[in-house]
Regions:
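Leucine-rich repeat
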Residues: 143, 164-168, 184-190, 206-212, ...
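Thr-biased low-complexity repeat/linker tracts and other Thr-enriched repetitive architectures
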Residues: 257, 265-267, 274-276, 287-289, ...
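N-terminal capping/linker segments that flank leucine-rich repeat
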Residues: 65-166, 170, 183, 227, ...
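Conserved hydrophobic beta-strand positions in leucine-rich repeat
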Residues: 147-149, 171-173, 193-195, 213-217, ...
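Gram-positive cell-envelope targeting signals
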Residues: 1-83
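Ankyrin-repeat and related helical/solenoid repeat scaffolds used for protein-protein interactions
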Residues: 365-422
Length: 441
């Protein structure tokens, strides 16, 4: 017997399901252009699994209506409507739009400080103290901005690892007690290095600093200059007061313009003959007797040879660009080689055996001349040298015949005539003629 009640109930449920499915698809039809299904489709969708799938598709379609992509093709007339609709303001947030979260970096934990904001640390306590005294506290992030370090007279015996300062161009460690230069060898970007007045004897760690332009190693215990041979870009080298005697390592440093070798044990100047760009050369207080290798250094402007064992300076004749020359305290008697130095302004030639100064007659640019303690009796070569500011003739056997010439030097500011044979009357006449000059007698 057929249960009509159950059949009716089943039919009623099917009709209800048909209405729900049809309603869902009509909603999608209004929003996405999906066609309303026929009875066959509705019959297939009466099964629970199919109906659940339909609900998922409907939900996706509804989300697509709100801002996503449509699940079904859009009718031509609907596409036209969408094309004609005004484009919303891109800054305007529409209801239902998906807004991505703002990507922000995660903060560091409170117990983990930013490594770039921590204070720069040094291994050597004494170095750290000197650095902090000069520069205060420096963060790790600031080290790349440090191009110069000036740690002069800080009582340093050791240098800390300075490789952390990769951009360092200038380093001044003068007047300390440093003897080990190994921490410097990796500072290959250095342009200027001052190691004046330390306890250095070994400079082998400097051989890698090929970009170095200026080096000061004055007042140390250095005897071997061979580690400097690779430093071919150097233009300035100061090595006063060391134990240097061999200059051969310098022969290849042809870009040198200033070279200081005062107070060493130098006697042979031949390696310097190739340094044709030299403009300043300081060789005083050595054991030099032969200066012929200097004859090719035509660019020389300043040359200091005082306190050596020179007797012949004829090789200086070709150095016509000379501006300042120091040759005092030697055994020189002839200065005729100076006649062609038209640019000479400073001449210190005291404590020699000079009698004749006629070679100075044409050197009208002279401003400062010292000829003390020689054997000069005639100063007529200096007549009307109005550019002279300072003149030292002390310790020469002059007499009153020099008074007339000296009265013509109206530009003088200081005149030393002590220990000469000029009378008091002659001194008085000179003072009257040169009221602006300080005349010592």
């Amino acid at each position: 017997m057929i249960n009509r009640k159950n059949t009716y109930k089943s039919k009623s449920n099917n009709e209800t399901d048909d209405k729900k499915a049809k309603s869902a698809l009509q909603h999608c039809s209004r929003n996405n252009g999906v066609r309303t299904p026929g009875p066959a489709v509705l019959t297939a969708l009466r099964k629970p699994a199919a109906f659940a799938l339909l609900i998922c598709i409907g939900a996706t379609a509804i989300l697509g209506c709100s801002g996503g992509e449509s699940l079904a093709p859009v009718k031509p007339e609907r596409a036209a409507e969408q094309t004609d609709s005004p484009v919303p303001n891109p800054t305007q947030v529409l209801s239902g739009d998906y807004i991505p979260p703002v990507q922000t970096p995660l903060p560091l934990p409170a117990d983990e400080p930013n490594p770039f904001e921590t204070e720069l640390q040094f291994n050597n306590e004494n170095f750290a103290r000197a650095f902090k005294y000069k520069y205060g506290s420096i963060c790790v992030s600031d080290r790349s901005s440090i191009a110069e370090l000036h740690l002069r007279r800080c009582g340093l015996m050791y240098i800390d690892d300075l490789t952390k300062f990769g951009y360092l161009r200038v380093l001044d460690l003068s007047e300390n007690m440093i003897y080990d230069l190994s921490p410097i060898e990796k500072l290959t970007a250095l342009r200027k290095l001052n190691l004046d007045t330390n306890n250095i004897s070994d400079i082998s760690h400097l051989s890698e600093l090929t970009e170095l332009l200026e080096l000061d190693i004055d007042k140390n215990n250095i005897s071997n200059l061979y580690p400097l041979t690779p430093l071919k870009n150097m233009t300035k080298l100061l090595a006063h007061e060391n134990e240097i005697h061999d200059l051969q390592p310098l022969s290849e440093l042809t870009k040198l313009q200033k070279l200081g070798l005062r107070s060493n044990s130098i006697s042979d100047l031949r390696p310097l003959s190739k340094l044709v760009e030299l403009r300043e050369l300081y060789l005083h207080d050595n054991s030099i007797s032969d200066i012929s290798p200097l004859s090719e250094l035509h660019e020389l402007r300043r040359l200091n040879l005082h306190d050596n064992v020179l007797s012949d300076i004829s090789e200086l004749r070709s150095l016509e660009n000379m501006e300042r020359l120091w040759i005092y305290n030697n055994s020189i008697s002839d200065i005729s080689a100076l006649a062609g130095m038209k640019e000479l302004s400073v001449l210190y030639a005291g404590m020699n055996s000079i009698e004749d100064i006629s070679s100075l007659a044409e050197l009208v640019n002279l401003t400062d001349v010292s000829l003390h303690n020689n054997a000069i009796t005639d100063v007529s070569a200096l007549e009307e040298h109005v550019n002279l500011k300072k003149l030292d003739l002390s310790g020469n056997p002059l007499d009153d015949s020099a008074v007339e010439v000296l009265c013509t030097l109206t530009g003088l500011e200081k005149l030393d005539l002590q220990r000469t044979g000029i009378s008091q009357e002659g001194i008085a006449a000179i003072r009257a003629a040169l009221p602006k000059a300080n005349v010592l007698a």
